[in-house]
Design a protein with these regions (language model features):
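Conserved alpha-helix/loop element of class I SAM-dependent methyltransferases that forms part
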Residues: 33
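Divalent metal-dependent catalytic cores for phosphoryl transfer on phosphate-bearing substrates
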Residues: 13-16, 40-155
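Generic N-terminal amphipathic, Lys/Arg-enriched alpha-helix
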Residues: 5-20
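Acidic-glycine-rich active-site phosphate/pyrophosphate-binding loop
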Residues: 1-8, 48
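A short, charge-rich alpha-helical start-of-domain segment used by transcription regulators
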Residues: 22-24
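Charged phosphate-binding loop/patch that engages nucleotide di/tri-phosphates or the phosphate backbone
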Residues: 161-197
Length: 197
């Protein structure tokens, strides 16, 4: 189940008031990118793509939800509202490699929460919506869409590293969606390839 677009936008605005920060504009950028990409892919609903992109980091509405905790908090918050399709993406968006050890940042939750996340990831098959939001997370800055290299450098600067296997997986996602669209990702999202990275 999903909120509608207006509900999702309202929920993000309210969450931004609770815990202001650049995370909310990052979510808006990811949502806009997801909608544009979905419009160019058969079998993907642009409205759903926008909504799940908009709320993928909603766990950051809780002030302490800065590292791994934002994943679990987002999942639990969306499940409380009955938005299981959003909750799923809250859980999967940081795991291009499907294990919690691949997380870039601190595992700042109790063991039972990290075990819940591990079990969740072990028992699902990532679908194209999961993959789409992983891709959009890797090209979205608060100021707007950027090259993947620029966004991954941003993460690396903030967290100290970005593992090569995750970096490679991000580029595989880019290639996967470019093949589905039959177009350059950067053309679709409006990033000028001349100015890359």
């Amino acid at each position: 189940m999903l909120p509608d677009r207006k509900e999702a936008e309202s929920f993000l605005r309210e969450s931004e008031e609770i815990h202001p920060g650049p995370w909310a504009d990052h979510c808006r950028t990811a949502a806009e990118c997801a909608e544009k990409i979905a419009r160019n892919c058969s079998g993907l609903d642009p409205e759903k793509a926008y909504i799940i992109g908009l709320l993928h980091d909603i766990g950051r509405r809780i002030e302490t939800g800065t590292h791994f905790k934002h994943i679990v908090d987002g999942y639990e918050c969306m499940m409380e509202y009955g938005y299981d399709e959003v909750a799923r993406v809250c859980m999967t968006h940081s795991f291009q490699i499907k294990n919690i050890e691949s997380y870039v940042g601190k595992i700042d939750v109790p063991e039972e929460k990290s075990e819940m996340a591990r079990t969740f990831l072990n028992h699902i098959e990532l679908d194209d919506y999961d993959l789409l939001i992983q891709l959009c997370d890797a090209i979205a800055l608060p100021e707007g869409p950027v090259s993947m290299e620029k966004r991954l450098r941003d993460i690396e600067e903030r967290y100290g590293s970005y593992p090569e296997d995750k970096r490679q997986r991000c580029y595989e996602l880019k290639a996967y969606f470019e093949e589905k669209m039959g177009r350059s990702l950067y053309d679709v999202i409006g990033v000028d390839e001349i100015t890359l990275p």
